[in-house]
Every structure is written in C-alpha cells, then in structure tokens.
C-alpha cells in the first residue's frame, strides 16, 4: 500500500509512535524514526530491521529548529523525497494511568508550560515547515498530526489540551495553504486513552494498547484531498472525518 513511500515518524521510538512506525513499515513504507531518546530509537529501528523492513533513524529534538532542519535535509539527501510526515512527538499527561503528575494552572511553572507547548505544538510546526517544500516540489504528500487527548478535562491538563487543540487549528490552516500543491493534512484522533509499553501494569490491564488503532495510520497516510483539514479517526477498517 505504501511501497516506495518515505515516511517520517516523529516520536517514533516508543508508544503510539512506535506502533505507527511498525504499521507503516508493514504497509511497505521506508520509515524514518525521529526521536530524542537515542537508545529507544535504535531499539525500535532494530525491531523493524529484524523484521526485514526498510527503516532508518535520525536523532533530533523537535523543539529545536536547527535540529529539525538538519533532520529533514538528511532524509532528503538519503532518499530524495518525503511522502509522509507523522507528527507524533509530544509530552503527554497520563491521568488515566492513575498518576496525576501535572499541576493545576496556579502551580504550573512557565518552564513546564513552554516545554509542553514547544514539543507538542512547536515540534509539529517546525517539522511541517521544513517538510512541505519537498512535498510541494513533487505536488504530493500526506501530513498526519496526532490529536490524541484533546478532549481531556482533568485538572492539570491545560498545557496539553491547549497544545492539542491548537494542532487541530494548525491542521486546518496548513491544509488550506497546501491544497493547491495536492498535500493532504489531517489530524488523527485515537478516540480514547491508550496505555503504551511504559504504562503501569494496572493501566495496561485496564486500557487498550496502540493495537486498537489497527491500520489507522496507514489509511491516514493515504488520505485523499477530500479529507484535508479534517480531524479523522479509525472506524471499522476505514478513516472517517469527525468534524
């Protein structure tokens, strides 16, 4: 389905990003894992290569423009194109794991607020900024922005929810800017809380894992222009717009 496609997955070393890396590779894409956690990045890269999938990895912190610029140019120098960008890298509150670890607004430091916004929203912006020129040059491409958790209402989730709701708005604006270039931009919603491999055992027993997303990322990576600017979710083997 994605044979011959080059797919960048930010935050691709663990959690939902790791699952996306596996499913995109299984669908035939050459997956480029981008992560700040170098050890986990190489572990996931090894998993893909052990399965005989085409994969590569670049260490980068998506908060930093120079690192994002370097990463994108390294990918283009090696592969000559970028077909899919999955913006997954993010800082996530795990309230559904029973760990209320983030403070309410009155106790929230500006440094922490900045870290969440710069990673979740700023990283999505920077990766998109540097990838779209290469998609425009080929008049083709798919950008998938993870929107998971945007509906959270837990005390202490303000920074996260603000970043995710801003990503939906960002998706709509970039979709309109890139429409003439045939670049499809969607926000992808997992629909529910997901327990990844780092979750406590209790949470993994109670909540679904990333496998519940099925082939959602593969379908989102092939979304047509009729869906550009929309928030989509995986449902019964298809992706459907929810806004």
How would you name each of these model-derived features?
Residues 2-32:
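Canonical Rossmann dinucleotide-binding motif of NAD(H)/NADP(H)-dependent dehydrogenases/reductases
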Residues 38-39, 59-73, 110:
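The beta1-alpha1 cofactor-binding region of Rossmann-like NAD(H)/NADP(H)-dependent oxidoreductases
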Residues 128-129, 172:
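A short, exposed helix-loop element centered on a Lys and neighboring polar residues
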Residues 104-110, 142-166, 171-172, 176-179, ...:
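Catalytic loop of short-chain dehydrogenase/reductase
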Residues 180-183, 187-191, 202-243:
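C-terminal helical subdomain
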Residues 5, 53-54, 81-82, 135-147, ...:
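Active-site loop of short-chain dehydrogenase/reductase
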Residues 96-105, 112-114:
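Substrate-binding pocket helix/loop in short-chain dehydrogenase/reductase
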């Amino acid at each position: 389905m994605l044979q011959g496609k080059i797919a960048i997955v930010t935050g691709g070393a663990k959690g939902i990003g790791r699952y996306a890396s596996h499913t995109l590779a299984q669908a035939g894409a050459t997956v480029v894992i981008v992560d700040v956690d170098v050890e986990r990045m190489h572990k996931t890269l090894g998993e893909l290569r052990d399965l005989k999938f085409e994969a590569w990895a670049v260490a980068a912190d998506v908060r930093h423009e120079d690192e994002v610029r370097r990463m994108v140019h390294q990918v283009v120098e090696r592969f000559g194109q970028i077909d899919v960008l999955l913006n997954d890298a993010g800082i996530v509150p795990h309230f559904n794991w029973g760990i209320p670890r983030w403070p309410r607004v009155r106790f929230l430091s500006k440094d922490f607020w900045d870290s969440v916004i710069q990673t979740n929203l700023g990283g999505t912006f920077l990766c998109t900024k540097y990838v779209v020129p290469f998609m425009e040059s080929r008049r083709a491409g798919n950008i998938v922005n993870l929107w998971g958790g945007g509906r959270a209402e837990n005390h202490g989730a303000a920074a996260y929810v603000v970043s995710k709701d801003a990503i939906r708005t960002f998706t709509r604006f970039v979709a309109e800017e890139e429409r003439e270039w045939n670049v499809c931009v969607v926000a992808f919603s997992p629909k529910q809380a997901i327990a990844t491999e780092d979750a406590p055992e209790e949470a993994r027993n109670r909540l679904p894992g990333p496998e519940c997303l099925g082939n959602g990322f593969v379908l989102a990576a092939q979304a047509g222009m009729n869906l550009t600017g929309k928030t989509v979710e995986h449902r019964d083997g298809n992706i459907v717009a929810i806004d």
